[in-house]
Curated annotation (Swiss-Prot):
The lineage of its organism: Bacteria, Pseudomonadati, Pseudomonadota, Gammaproteobacteria, Enterobacterales. Homodimer. The gene is tdcD. This is Propionate kinase. The active site is at D143 (proton donor/acceptor). One of its GO terms (molecular function) is metal ion binding. Catalyzes the conversion of propionyl phosphate and ADP to propionate and ATP. It is an enzyme of class 2 (transferase). One of its GO terms (biological process) is L-threonine catabolic process to propionate. SUPFAM superfamilies: Actin-like ATPase domain (SSF53067).
Amino acid sequence: MNEFPVVLVINCGSSSIKFSVLDVATCDVLMAGIADGMNTENAFLSINGDKPINLAHSNYEDALKAIAFELEKRDLTDSVALIGHRIAHGGELFTQSVIITDEIIDNIRRVSPLAPLHNYANLSGIDAARHLFPAVRQVAVFDTSFHQTLAPEAYLYGLPWEYFSSLGVRRYGFHGTSHRYVSRRAYELLDLDEKNSGLIVAHLGNGASICAVRNGQSVDTSMGMTPLEGLMMGTRSGDVDFGAMAWIAKETGQTLSDLERVVNKESGLLGISGLSSDLRVLEKAWHEGHERARLAIKTFVHRIARHIAGHAASLHRLDGIIFTGGIGENSVLIRQLAIEHLGVLGLTLDVEMNKQPNSHGERIISANPSQVICAVIPTNEEKMIALDAIHLGNVKAPVEFA
């Protein structure tokens, strides 16, 4: 192993590969980028925001070869001691991160029908990385595994039992790597005892979810069998009455596939506003008095507050509410409006602290005194994946989370 080992973190999406290279000793990011537009003539690779490199018609292995070439140019290839892969769905088979073996790959493939759009892409990334780095230990980190501590009453749907027992239909939850990282950071920031604590983490981005964390374990979460359930999101409807969808199908003649597209791609902030799924665009429109943009934001916030309050019922105590994700970290307006809804929980906002930019990093934004502490903690899923890889790979870990 090189004297200065690094972890390569890979996140293969349906049409892209996001990656980062982190120093094992510090978990500082040394290099990061994205290969996007896989299998199209417009595919490209961008490193550290530099000029894109043409990767026309490249598949996952081609793109990873290009990434490996960029590592070689920076004398980092021999330093790659570990590779961490983000895996979208682990089903009930994976309760924690694991070292990748042939058996693990077979088991990931078994649960992949639960998330076909992402898991098969994840597997393509694993296959390519194992081929390009055959001597490097590789680790799978599952977006669902943090939520495998949910009790049956929290994960079961009120459907006939055979759908659960035969098909695995249940709540799995997502954003687990983010919720796990942020809750761990919260114990330090808020000076809490992990073994006797209650947190609500609100991961708010284009995809959004709430997680109740009791004594260090996820006990409830808003996303379900798929990432569609729960909060209203950028283009996803979130919770919706199935009876309403059945009525729409009857009245319009739309198929199940049509309606899946509607609730996943045409709803949420975009659907209500008719303007954009980008909250930055909607906030500008909010201040300009755009009626439907204001209604979209109000609906988004109402759902956030309702889910935060509801998830508090899964805790034995409520010590803190944490905002994270692109919107949770950066939107002063969304945090302010959400906290105004949550006075019933004893939450009071410090308006000036809430206005601090995300460049300030981890910060408490509740007033003193406030019955419940509210904070903003920037998520770092890449770091959490790297830390899992370091731990499982038996490489000397940083003090943090060691």
